Amino acid sequence: MLVSHVFLLTLSLSVPSLGQYEHWPYYPEYQGPPEPPPTQPKIVPQIHVRLAGEKRKHNEGRVEVYYEGEWGTVCDDDFSMYAAHIVCRELGYQEAVSWSPSSKYGKGEGRIWLDNVNCNGRERSIASCSSNGWGVTDCKHSEDVGVQCSDRRIPGFKVSNELPGHLEGLNIQVEDVRIRPILSAYRKRVPVTEGFAEVKVQGSWRQVCNTQWSSKNSRVVCGMFGFPSEKKYNTKVYKMFSSRRKHTYWQFSANCTGNEPHLSSCKVGGVLSPDPKTNQTCSDGAPAVVSCTPGRAFAPSPGTGFRKAFRQEQPLVRLRGGANVGEGRVEVLKNGEWGTVCDDKWNLVTASVICRELGFGSAKEALVGAQLGQGMGQIHMSEIQCNGFEKSLTDCKFNIHSQGCNHEEDAAVRCNVPAMGFENQVRLSGGRHPTEGRVEVLMERNGTLRWGTVCSETWGTMEAMIVCRQLGLGFASHAFQETWYWQGDINADDVVMSGVKCSGTEMSLAHCRHDGANVNCPRGGGRFAAGVSCVETAPDLVLNAALVEQTTYLEDRPMFMLQCAHEEQCLASSADRTSPTTGYRRLLRFSSQIHNNGQADFRPKTGRHAWIWHDCHRHYHSMEVFTHYDLLTLNGTKVAEGHKASFCLEDSECEADIQKQYVCANFGEQGITVGCWDLYRHDIDCQWVDITDVAPGDYFFQIIINPNQEVAESDYTNNIMKCRCRYDGQRIWMYNCHIGGSYSTETEEKFEHFSGLLNNQLSTR
């Protein structure tokens, strides 16, 4: 029997008297350090911690603490790595990497809550560490402390950004909530959409009485389990079923308004007194039933029981840059152009409107500070205020002006999604860490479910990304075609899946195209079985389209000045027949500026030992294919292409306060840092397309970054830039340059037929 669960949670409730209401604060439980925790003080105030300030990554920032209804900072006096570890663990990271004094991440505002913090490293909260006391300090905000946490998350840790209440009185703990399917039609259904609402108290599951249960309560529970709304159910069937069973009821009731992101945010409806005659807590009622409506991506379909791939069909709102289904940076469509949302006043209620609009449940995290990467283009909405019942984010109140906002404040969300059980159909075996290993899948062969390996012949980054998504481990950092160094399960050595090819939208590896039962793997499994390595964050490369449009020009260059480029095959094949003394080549030249807007540095796939030295450029190239430069006819036929042999990756320039890390000279480390860009100027060798043989006409000019997807990115849709191009034999006009995915389909089609031009004259050098 299938049962929907949520992760362990603790609810602290206050019930002063029957008929009065109090809010339920929410305490996420997570795995603490391996050492046994010390004896906690009798009273440890409930706080929330966040990383704020001038930061570039989600796992670093100024430490801020929410206490007594107000956010405040922590002074750097006596702060240590022990304290940094506590802060990071409290936020769900396994450990701290470093801490920074003297307001490295900017000066905070308001109170300085803690000073002279002294931790031993085993506390569960910074509130348990010794200090001068709350608000007792002689510090200034120039001494605000910051931390950088490890990328690795604590397994199973769930974040709630609901602010805690301030309660006194009776302490009641609820350990878990579930929907338990009762009718046979729902017991084998995936996902579980209907059943009794039950809570776990002191290790035992108990039903919730329906005498004070409402559809608003059901809406909240459905949202917790990844469903956008509740629906009616057959009350007669459940009444008949309930009368035949003895039930153990929870002695409390809940009173939700319907817009809460979690049952823990609802109010306590009162204590249910037992009937004096029957001694039953719910003698006049029955167990509360919850029936949910799944979103499009999770609705049952004939033959499979679920959709094979998640395809975003919502025309007004989308999520970008997330590792998993139901998470990402929020983008909205306005006047045909996609733009982001500023995180001012961003909260779970507003985030839940987006999640439900996209067919998911309520929001489990409302993320601020571009935690899932920075977007591009306009910021369309700011200071959004929703009541939680809107059909679309555009129905909420918001400020159309975004003064003071920038893409460092892009809002993001993680939604509750239905439990499909996909994570139980694949595993990683033999790796040094839980995030890497040989891929083993559970497949039906000859009527029996068995574990086996995946043939690596067609294995690449996109397939590895699906595995990491399926396991909830983030993005793929590497896709391995040899795994002899990982000793997997000896009983799973046989190849059970081959010919795997994924598009990137699938929710599990089984949804990708593959050979099915007709496994064909000439190279065999064993050392050639597929493997992956997963990471929580990924880079995101975006080309500056405006710069390409502004710097494009034609140059007639003599062949004797192109000797090095000719040797590197940067010219069209007809250059082999061109006179080296009197001939020339017509070059379409331009500058390209490639930004890393993601959450991790972009690093070449190959190690330093495989880099190639280029005499002409006098440095090593780390990627053989980093970009494609193509000139296409209007029907997509390629008529000319750039032949830039390979690339050296470095930080040409960076945003303010970001240090360059990568440089090509002197065999330096190569890559592109988050917040930096690599500039290829129009006047360097091979930064062109040889159009000597191209006839006059209208064309598309296209640039694709990381075309073979050798390096994993959080978003590949923005790796393509396309321009309209008109060439009359002597002059060229480049116009309507834009990044893939930045406009609606309708607007994209208009661009392809728009005739606005920029005049770029012929240059002779």
Swiss-Prot record:
Organism equals Xenopus laevis (African clawed frog)
Keyword Secreted in annotation: yes
Which intervals of the chain are annotated as region Lysyl-oxidase like? 539-742
A Gene Ontology cellular-component term: extracellular space
- Please name the gene that encodes this protein: loxl2
List cofactor names only.
Cu cation; lysine tyrosylquinone residue
EC code: 1.4.3.13
Q: How is the cofactor bound?
A: Contains 1 lysine tyrosylquinone.
Pfam families reported in the protein's UniProt record: Lysyl_oxidase, SRCR
Q: What's the protein called, per UniProt?
A: Lysyl oxidase homolog 2
User: Into which family does the record put it?
Assistant: Belongs to the lysyl oxidase family.
Residues bound to Ca(2+) = 540-541, 713, 715, 718-719
Residues annotated with 2',4',5'-topaquinone modification: 680
